[in-house]
Design a protein with these regions (language model features):
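Hydrophobic ligand-binding cavity/cleft-lining segments
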Residues: 1-62
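Short, surface-exposed coil-to-beta transition loops
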Residues: 11-13, 76-81, 104-110
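Solvent-exposed residues in well-ordered beta-strands and their adjoining turns
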Residues: 17-21, 66-70, 85-87, 115, ...
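A short, structured loop/turn motif at beta-sheet edges
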Residues: 22, 50-57, 85-91, 113-128
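Hydrophobic pocket/interface hotspot
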Residues: 25-29, 35, 84, 131, ...
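Short amphipathic alpha-helical signal-transduction/dimerization elements
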Residues: 33, 148, 152, 156-167
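Glycine-rich portal/gate segments that line the openings of hydrophobic small-molecule binding cavities
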Residues: 47-99, 162-166
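Beta-strand/loop substructures that line and gate deep hydrophobic ligand-binding cavities in soluble
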Residues: 94-154
Length: 169
């Protein structure tokens, strides 16, 4: 049953097949601090102190993340506290919203899965990144679908460039 006023949950999956080192790609997607460098809707992602109840994994596992978007004159921004809740190098990383202000918050989940076709000895196929975003709140409006879709398309070459620059330097 939907909450009153809720349009619907948002579930988006995007894939990227790219000729980049799998380990270097994983290094980028496992660290939310890199996202502002290649994903424009993430305007800021700063590490924050992990707190009891975060259930974070993998070192600095919590970030304060600012999301922003604009369609015509309409602007939206959102600050989230995200925690890396799963990290299985070099295959899977998952981030979940974890606020500690005593209020009830909408669910945000971002996961990334990497498939390295060369890991089993095959040649010629490119590594594939599959990212999934789930938003369980009621503030999503249809025009944000277009914004997100456009941003995903623009981010693909930026991510490849960013990974290649980091692995070369």
């Amino acid at each position: 049953m939907r909450d009153a006023g809720r349009l619907s949950d948002v579930d988006v999956t995007a894939t990227l097949a790219a000729d980049v080192p799998v380990d270097a790609l994983f290094d980028v997607v496992e660290d939310l601090g890199t996202y502002p460098d290649w994903l424009d809707i993430v305007s800021r992602a700063e590490p924050v102190e992990p707190l009891p109840g975060d259930d974070g994994v993998g070192g600095a596992a919590a970030w304060s993340v600012d999301l922003r978007g604009q369609v015509g004159p309409f602007r939206r921004s959102k600050r989230l506290r995200m925690v890396r809740t799963r990290c299985e190098r070099p295959d899977v990383v998952r981030f979940e919203r974890r606020e500690h202000d005593g209020k009830r918050h909408s669910e945000w989940v971002l996961s990334a899965e990497l498939v390295d076709p060369g890991a089993d000895g095959t040649t010629g196929a490119l590594p594939e990144l599959r990212m999934r975003l789930h938003y369980g709140g009621n503030l999503w409006v249809p025009m944000l679908d277009r914004l997100l879709s456009d941003e995903i398309e623009r981010s693909r070459p930026r991510l490849v460039r960013y990974v290649n620059d980091r692995s070369a330097g």
